[in-house]
Amino acid sequence: MAKLTKRMRVIREKVDGTKSYDINEAVALLKELATAKFVESVDVAVNLGIDPRKSDQNVRGATVLPHGTGRDVRVAVFTQGANAEAAKAAGAELVGMDDLAEKIKAGEMNFDVVIASPDAMRVVGMLGQILGPRGLMPNPKTGTVTPNVAEAVKNAKAGQVRYRNDKNGIIHTTIGKVDFTPVQLKENLEALVSALKKAKPAVAKGIFVKKISISTTMGAGVAVDQATLETTV
């Protein structure tokens, strides 16, 4: 049996895996146990009451967190004309059409989000094998294919998170950094859960949000008592 590190022993002593914690207590635990030499991200896993094998029960979308994610987001935009100028004015690092596609084909991938206006999808469509596996392919459901590219750029820069359930019906995303205040992390989590509830598929039956766990990059998951969250449906 592998020997537990000192860090893991401390986590096991502090975190009760059978308990759901008040959100404030859960955040305090994460902060206490975040001892890495860098500012860890705070990640969330939300178990949904869906059958992920059925396409009409899959959950996918995006929402802007009120306090952002703490990350500097680099944005690439496929568009032209007045939209190109608007995207640049909104803060996009890369804007273009065929010229931008050629850069990506050549391996230049120094961006975190790709946005496209509908008229640019003929160009973006040819990059599916490059962007798709990296989770960067623009999609109307996440607001990254839109005629209003400037607004999409602003949302991405403001801390928009995109979510999509995995094959087990779990949503994984980030809600900030461990140096955020407890209130900021709580409000970001509440915004995400509210967005997920609004995205509930009509055919999903029973309890929709089954379990919420938060963790830091190097830490263990801490289950959150949903009753301590203020969310809207």
From Swiss-Prot:
Entry keywords, A to Z: Repressor, Ribonucleoprotein, Ribosomal protein, RNA-binding, rRNA-binding, Translation regulation, tRNA-binding
One BP annotation, GO: regulation of translation
Quaternary state and interactors: Part of the 50S ribosomal subunit.
Matches recorded under InterPro entries: Ribosom_uL1_bac-type, Ribosomal_uL1, Ribosomal_uL1-like, Ribosomal_uL1/biogenesis, Ribosomal_uL1_3-a/b-sand, Ribosomal_uL1_CS
Protein name listed in UniProt: Large ribosomal subunit protein uL1
Physiological role: Binds directly to 23S rRNA. The L1 stalk is quite mobile in the ribosome, and is involved in E site tRNA release. Protein L1 is also a translational repressor protein, it controls the translation of the L11 operon by binding to its mRNA.
Similarity-based family: Belongs to the universal ribosomal protein uL1 family.
